[in-house]
């Protein structure tokens, strides 16, 4: 089983000289979002851990066994500060024992003096529509649910109004993500789209009002 924590996240943090984390926030407990978090927690200290209000998945249970971080369950409308950066919890649905973890996905807006990013996990269209009237624009949007047609509704995209939309998705996946309808909606709202299945790992920086995106893929063929 490929562990993104030990194979990707930890080496990159060490490359950057990061030896501890002030905060780790997980959108929800599915393996493709929380997998690898336990390996990170086992190797570097974490001060605060923010989790969705859902039944803990196996990945989150493993994480909790490997950290002494202050445990915080996210609540809608709560803000946290990291220096000059604000972490805004826009939506934090409370999941039930029999609900899909996607329905508990956090929608989070990260804002600094340089720019803003909206993270959506696997948020559903229903959750997006409930937050469309509350969320402020974000220059960058992490597109929900790998670009599924069942997310990224036009009211939500209009509210966020992203310059750049990032789709984290595996090449040749069996779900057909990203969906053609989602790509059409992103084009209609004027967002530049970058995809990990085409571009590999992406690094995003802010330069004044401009958003810059760098690809770390060196081969033309799919991974």
Label for each model-derived stretch:
Residues 1-223:
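Non-globular, low-confidence helical/coil segments that flank catalytic cores
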């Amino acid at each position: 089983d490929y562990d993104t924590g030990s194979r990707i996240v930890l080496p990159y943090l060490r490359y950057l000289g990061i030896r501890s984390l002030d905060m780790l926030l997980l959108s929800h407990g599915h393996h493709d979002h929380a997998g690898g978090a336990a390996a990170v927690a086992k190797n570097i200290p974490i001060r605060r851990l923010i989790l969705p209000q859902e039944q803990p998945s196996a990945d989150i249970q493993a994480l909790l066994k490997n950290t002494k971080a202050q445990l915080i369950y996210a609540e809608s409308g709560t803000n946290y500060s990291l220096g000059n950066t604000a972490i805004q919890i826009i939506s934090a649905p409370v999941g039930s024992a029999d609900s899909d973890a996607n329905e508990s996905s956090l929608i989070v807006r990260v804002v600094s003096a340089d720019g803003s990013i909206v993270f959506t996990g696997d948020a559903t269209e229903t959750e997006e529509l409930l937050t469309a009237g509350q969320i402020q624009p974000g220059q960058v949007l992490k597109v929900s649910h790998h670009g599924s047609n069942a997310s990224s509704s036009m009211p939500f995209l209009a509210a966020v109004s992203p310059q750049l939309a990032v789709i984290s998705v595996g090449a040749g996946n069996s779900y057909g993500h990203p969906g053609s309808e989602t790509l059409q909606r992103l084009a209609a709202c004027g967002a530049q789209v970058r995809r990990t299945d085409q571009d590999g790992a992406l690094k995003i920086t802010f330069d004044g009002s401009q958003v810059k995106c760098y690809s770390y893929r060196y081969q033309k063929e799919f991974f």
